[in-house]
Amino acid sequence: MTAVPAHDHHTLQDFIERHQRLFVLTGAGCSTDSGIPDYRDLQGGWKRPQPVTFQAFMGELSTRQRYWARSLVGWPRFGLAQPNATHHALAALEARGQLEVLLTQNVDRLHQAAGSQAVIDLHGRLDVVRCMGCERRMPRTEFQVLLEQANPGWAALEAAQAPDGDADLDDVAFEHFVVPPCPVCGGVLKPNVVFFGENVPRARVERAFAHLQAADAVLVVGSSLMVYSGFRFVQTAARNGLPIAALNFGRTRADELLTLKVEQSCAQALAFLHAPPHLPRARSVNDASARSA
């Protein structure tokens, strides 16, 4: 397929209204209007140092100290984030009966908060903490209490919000930060998300591919697709001949595979989903001029 440059959200509206079983794949660009920063620039490069790897988190106490210190400071704001117009528009798409599944690379659960039900959290969820020893789960809010009790004064630190529910703590020493162990077995506690270098659970991937098999088109919203765990679904869709549209500012890894690309605000481009389906579109000045020419 060849990427089609498009700047008019009506083209995207036509694409969506032509399909009834959309496989929607979302990324960080969906949540920026909720106050959660994204990761990449318009060229798909990193805006900040790369996220922690699974191997470093599990193998180095210093990495866990730094991760959980930043998370202690950033979690309260992240946990209070609310769904924005993009999340609500995609929930409306499901209510119209046009959604096969919504596969999100985000870990913020804002799609569910907006009312979406057919959601697969590809990379897990940040509001749950998992013991890597006994597999016990606990709410992130519960672990926040343990972190603050073990590290008095840290919650009062001020820092800019970062993408992973953490905060940009500069010039802070972490060597005395206390990371609470699992209260049951004493094991290492980790957010229940897929880190870089960690595999997405196979059953989750297979479930997503089953939905892709049943879909009649793919819609990418707010993702550069630079991470292979998300890109592979678009790659497979292209191989199977499915039409693919992307709504994203800047370059995506799949540009050469796209049927349609729209570089606009996600919320603005999807605003039509809040209206009842199949209503005639309002005529623009350009439409009227074209008809009278």
Curated annotation (Swiss-Prot):
Record's catalysed reaction(s): N(6)-acetyl-L-lysyl-[protein] + NAD(+) + H2O = 2''-O-acetyl-ADP-D-ribose + nicotinamide + L-lysyl-[protein]
Signal peptide stretch: none
Keywords: Cytoplasm, Metal-binding, NAD, Transferase, Zinc
Pfam families per UniProt: SIR2
Compartment(s): Cytoplasm
Free-text cofactor note: Binds 1 zinc ion per subunit.
Cofactor: Zn(2+)
Family annotation (InterPro entries): DHS-like_NAD/FAD-binding_dom, NAD-dep_sirtuin_deacylases, Sirtuin, Sirtuin_cat_small_dom_sf, Sirtuin_class_II, Ssirtuin_cat_dom
Entry superkingdom: Bacteria
GO CC aspect terms: cytoplasm
Enzyme class of the recorded protein, top EC level: transferase
Keyword set includes Cytoplasm: yes
GO MF annotations in UniProt: histone deacetylase activity, NAD-dependent; NAD+ binding; zinc ion binding
Domain spans labelled Deacetylase sirtuin-type: 5-282
Role this protein plays: NAD-dependent protein deacetylase which modulates the activities of several enzymes which are inactive in their acetylated form.
Protein name: NAD-dependent protein deacetylase
Native source species: Xanthomonas axonopodis pv. citri (strain 306)
Top-level taxonomy: Bacteria, Pseudomonadati, Pseudomonadota, Gammaproteobacteria, Lysobacterales
